[in-house]
A protein has these predicted regions:
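Juxtamembrane extracytoplasmic/periplasmic/luminal helical "stalk" adjacent to the first N-terminal
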Residues: 1-38
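Intrinsically disordered, low-complexity polar/acidic regions
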Residues: 4, 33-196, 200, 204
Length: 205
């Protein structure tokens, strides 16, 4: 029972962190829904105000029609401009899942085209056309520093309490198991498995 409680508490922490970042993404989403466009200056200023003090979010991106059109900070991430998330081989499965489901998805971590490694939180944006029908506008995307994100969830406390842990996912296209984070010596027996929700590729603790 103690192990189950520890695992469930950890899952709750991970989901709470994701919801915190999603709230920031939703601010951008609401602005697009109201105005359909946002200037580079407005985007940069809003993104700057939303930067978290721990810098877990390393970049904010807007992807109109699925293609990265605006990034913040610009200089560090300008190489990502023009990347089509709906067609990129590594990102298209998660991006299309978010688009089709209308729900956010977390994917990665990936080697980023602008350098470094990060997970991507895709938040799909829909706007009403002149007939009142919803049309896909694109994505608000948060680039998450994976190592800092894991540190924020305090997974190391599980090991300090005598538990071993491993977070892994199955890649959508290949069903291959990929380990995202683990303790120094994860156990393979007497394990408890829990799922995280709203993850584009099934992720387990």
């Amino acid at each position: 029972l103690k192990a189950a409680y520890a695992a469930e508490t950890t899952v709750s922490k991970v989901e709470a962190q994701l919801n915190k970042y999603l709230t920031e993404s939703e601010l951008m989403e609401k602005l697009i829904e109201e105005r359909t466009e946002i200037t580079d200056t407005e985007f940069s200023e809003l993104s700057r105000l939303m930067q978290d003090e721990n810098q877990v979010i390393s970049a904010h991106e807007l992807a109109k029609d699925g293609c990265i059109s605006q990034v913040y900070p610009f200089e560090e991430n300008k190489e990502a401009i023009g990347l089509d998330m709906l067609k990129d081989p590594e990102r298209k499965a998660a991006a299309n899942l978010a688009k089709d489901s209308g729900e956010y998805t977390l994917a990665g971590p990936y080697e980023l085209v602008q350098g470094g490694v990060g997970a991507l939180l895709f938040d799909p944006i829909y706007i009403e056309d002149s007939s009142g029908e919803e049309q896909f506008w694109g994505f608000s995307i948060l680039v998450i520093d994976w190592d800092k994100f894991i540190a924020q969830t305090e997974l190391s406390k599980l090991e300090d309490a005598g538990y071993s842990y491993q977070i892994w996912k199955k890649v959508l296209d290949t069903d291959k198991k990929v380990v995202l984070a683990q303790c120094e010596k994860p156990k393979e027996k007497d394990t408890l498995e829990l799922s995280l929700i709203h993850i584009s590729e099934p992720t387990r603790l």
